[in-house]
């Protein structure tokens, strides 16, 4: 017999009760679309308190209570919005957003991530637009009121990225402040020392302008604006910087370019790129919220791989942030005849155009004017994700400098030499003594091993030898992998089985 109190008043074990409560919460959230911001804030807090118990029930674990989870994030967002203040200097704005304001962005994304069906997304969207949009507009007004004194006004004001021995600059397009703060938490939990800093992006806040805004590279670039883009030109040739030329310039500055998924030998100074945050945002709009965690997990893994192979310092940098608003950012009218080039959040004005919108100078040539979309609006309708304007979300950019703790929180493995002799791989590793060494087609999957027998790393400076069992594997792409005592990969190096392109690789000084 079922105990009489099994289906008690709370209804924790009744799926029908949970469904009814989800429907009620959905209705209450959708009603916020017509509520004043103050009333919406109060209602969100009330609803969060009412539905908080359901977020711990089994139905939430099973994915049957998405709104019970989302309302908690909406409450967190509301609490930040209510304590926002009115900072009126660049320093005060930066301090507010880097320390507190970013939490509203994070909570908003988490609420969207929790609610993925059409119905629940509409409900969460109504709450976000009622509370978060007014907050965005308030701070965009505060920020744009200071536009004439913007801190980053040209190459002489931009950051410096010196070519330092053992350093990798990891560029992550669109790594906004809130995502960087979450990444910081992940990296600290991984045992890394993290120094978090922030600065101002180049204007307009688009990749074409902002990616190259660092010294000494910026000293080689300039204007004027030509065509429809915001790309700087190389002063010596007058040509726009292509990706291929960017890589050449890095080499000239003493910095190697590491392609994706390659760690290489940790010598000299390097630049690498990772992530698709900005791409997902442009392609999927508000659904970017569903991708954030996997993007950050991938970025964390890439950083740890670089540390594990022996790079002593990783500096994560970005070019710009972005605005995201489910249901679309407001529209600002800018007729085509008033703009020589019109982007979502910025434009190149036509000669003599009268439009009444905020203006700034182009980062690469102060003689060139740029129109900024007012507030958080776009010159194109229906955009849920955009950047190019002047808001804290777009313009205040983070950087993270990472290194291993002096106490040795992360074990580093360094590959010193590697050579194939037939199907036998001979190598010299540092930091791998007693750890399992393998050759696999998939780094984290031990079942994809090519090794004839399990082996462990030799002492530092001594040769470790591994035999590949299957002659038919010659020429196959694989990874040399070192794992810790828990079976977790801590080092990987792409290889080609049996290929002598990797004839004895010894570290040669390549000072930056």
Please name every model-derived segment.
Residues 1-167, 174-512:
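…; additionally, a secondary subgroup of soluble metalloenzymes is captured
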């Amino acid at each position: 017999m079922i105990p009489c109190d099994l289906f008690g008043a709370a209804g924790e074990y009744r799926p029908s009760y949970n469904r009814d409560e989800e429907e009620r919460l959905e209705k209450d959230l959708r009603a916020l679309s017509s509520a004043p911001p103050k009333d919406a804030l109060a209602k969100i807090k009330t609803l969060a308190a009412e539905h908080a118990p359901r977020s711990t029930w089994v139905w939430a674990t099973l994915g049957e209570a998405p709104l019970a989870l989302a309302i908690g994030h909406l409450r967190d967002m509301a609490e930040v919005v209510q304590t926002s203040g009115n900072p009126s200097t660049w320093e005060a704005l930066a301090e507010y957003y880097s320390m507190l304001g970013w939490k509203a962005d994070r909570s908003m994304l988490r609420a969207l991530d929790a609610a993925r069906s059409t119905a629940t997304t509409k409900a969460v969207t109504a709450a976000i637009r009622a509370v978060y949009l007014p907050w965005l507009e308030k701070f965009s007004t505060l920020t744009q009121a200071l536009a004439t004194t913007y801190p980053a006004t040209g190459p002489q004001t931009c950051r410096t990225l010196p070519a330092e021995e053992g350093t990798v600059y990891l560029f992550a397009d669109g790594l906004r402040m809130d995502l960087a703060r979450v990444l910081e938490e992940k990296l600290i939990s991984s045992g890394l020392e993290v120094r978090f800093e922030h600065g101002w992006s180049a204007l307009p806040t688009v990749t074409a302008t902002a990616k190259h805004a660092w010294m000494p590279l910026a000293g080689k670039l300039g204007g004027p604006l030509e065509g429809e883009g915001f790309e700087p030109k190389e002063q010596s040739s007058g040509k726009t910087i292509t990706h291929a030329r960017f890589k050449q310039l890095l080499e000239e500055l003493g910095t190697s370019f590491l392609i994706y998924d390659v760690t290489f030998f940790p010598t000299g100074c390097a630049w690498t790129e990772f992530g698709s945050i900005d791409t997902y945002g442009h392609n999927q709009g508000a659904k970017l919220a569903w991708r954030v965690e996997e993007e950050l997990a991938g970025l964390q893994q890439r950083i740890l791989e670089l540390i594990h192979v022996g790079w002593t310092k990783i500096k994560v940098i970005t070019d710009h942030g972005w605005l995201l608003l489910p249901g679309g950012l407001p529209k600002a009218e800018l007729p085509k005849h008033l703009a020589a080039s019109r982007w979502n959040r910025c434009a190149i004005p036509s000669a003599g155009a009268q439009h009444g919108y905020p203006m700034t100078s182009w980062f690469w040539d102060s003689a060139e004017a740029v129109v900024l979309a007012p507030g958080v609006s776009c010159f194109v309708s229906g955009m849920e994700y955009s950047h190019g304007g002047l808001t804290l979300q777009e313009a205040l950019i983070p950087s993270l400098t990472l290194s291993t703790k002096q106490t040795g929180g992360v074990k580093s493995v360094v590959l010193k030499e590697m050579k194939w002799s037939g199907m036998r791989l001979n190598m010299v590793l540092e930091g791998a003594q007693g750890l399992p060494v393998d050759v696999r087609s998939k780094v984290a999957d031990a079942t994809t091993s090519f090794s004839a027998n399990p082996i462990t790393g030799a002492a530092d400076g001594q040769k470790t030898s591994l035999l590949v069992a299957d002659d038919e594997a010659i020429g196959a792409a694989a990874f040399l992998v070192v794992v810790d005592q828990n079976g977790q990969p801590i080092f990987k190096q792409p290889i080609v089985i049996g290929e002598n392109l990797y004839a004895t690789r010894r570290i040669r000084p390549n000072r930056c």
